[in-house]
A protein has these predicted regions:
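Conserved beta-strand-loop-alpha-helix hinge in the C-terminal portion
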Residues: 204-225
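Catalytic Walker B motif of ABC-type/P-loop ATPase nucleotide-binding domains
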Residues: 149-152
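Conserved ABC ATPase "signature" region
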Residues: 102-120
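H-loop/switch region of ABC-family ATPase nucleotide-binding domains
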Residues: 184-185
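Helix-to-loop junction immediately C-terminal to a conserved catalytic motif
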Residues: 52
Length: 240
């Protein structure tokens, strides 16, 4: 598999002395569904901002293949919605690419159709449910044809229908061969979809391996609920 992101011994220290990340190294491969777990304060969101080049590491470096620039779905989807309607919002994303109007409209329509929002393209974006807003955020990324998608705590503040909507999108993106990085402490929702599992704790990488092996860890020690306390195995975590 093609190596598309190389995270090489990165550390991030802030002016007040806080160490958010400490010597973290791993690679992301094309087609990965990488689940990164950790409790609040483990460094997940800081790591996301570094991979997406919204911030710079204090030391170490991150190498991203040019054709695999990241598209982000933030924990607060409202912060990504700039248009009054889903159509306006996705068109705003596409216009940044300076495409001909007809091509921009085709991309916007295709992205909204993939996320099941085309029929709602003219509704008020502000009145959408949490799950719909996450889908709209994904639509904007898809319209820009990003191959690497990063989800930061995608299930935060979602009701169960919203969770199912977001998981459904992830399953479809995985089937399309997209590379997904999901940062969450709610691992039971996507553990069965993941191809790799990373655990962060207090800014350090504690585990990088298969989800099956990850479930054998004392996850509670890292502030992560082990789904095997409620389910028998990964097969019980599959979404139908």
């Amino acid at each position: 598999m093609q190596k598309i992101v190389q995270v090489q011994k990165i550390s991030r220290r802030f002016a007040d002395g806080t160490v958010a990340l400490d010597g973290v190294s791993f690679d992301i491969f094309q087609g990965d569904f990488l689940l990164i777990a950790g409790s609040n304060g483990s460094g997940k969101s800081v790591l996301m901002s570094l991979i997406a080049r919204l911030d710079e590491p204090t030391s170490g470096k991150i190498v991203v293949q040019k054709s695999f620039e990241a598209g982000l779905v933030f924990q607060d989807a409202d912060s990504q919605i700039l248009g009054e309607t889903p159509w306006e919002d996705v068109m705003f994303s596409v216009k940044n690419l300076r495409l001909p109007k007809s091509e921009a409209q085709e991309r916007a329509a295709a992205a909204l159709e993939k996320t099941g929002l085309l029929e709602k393209k003219d509704m008020s974006a502000r009145t959408m449910s949490g799950g719909e807003k996450r889908r709209l955020a994904v639509s904007g990324i898809l319209s820009m044809e990003r191959e690497l998608l990063i989800f930061d705590e995608p299930f935060a503040n979602l009701d169960w229908p919203g969770v199912r909507q977001v998981v459904s999108i992830m399953k479809e993106l995985k089937a399309q061969g997209k590379t997904l990085v999901v940062l969450t402490h709610e691992i039971e929702k996507v553990m069965a979809l993941a191809s790799r599992f990373i655990v962060l704790d207090k800014g350090r990488l504690c585990f990088d391996g298969s989800p099956k092996d990850g479930l054998r860890l004392p996850l509670e020690n890292y502030g992560i609920k082990n789904p095997l306390n409620s389910y028998k195995g990964l097969e019980d975590l599959l979404w139908n």
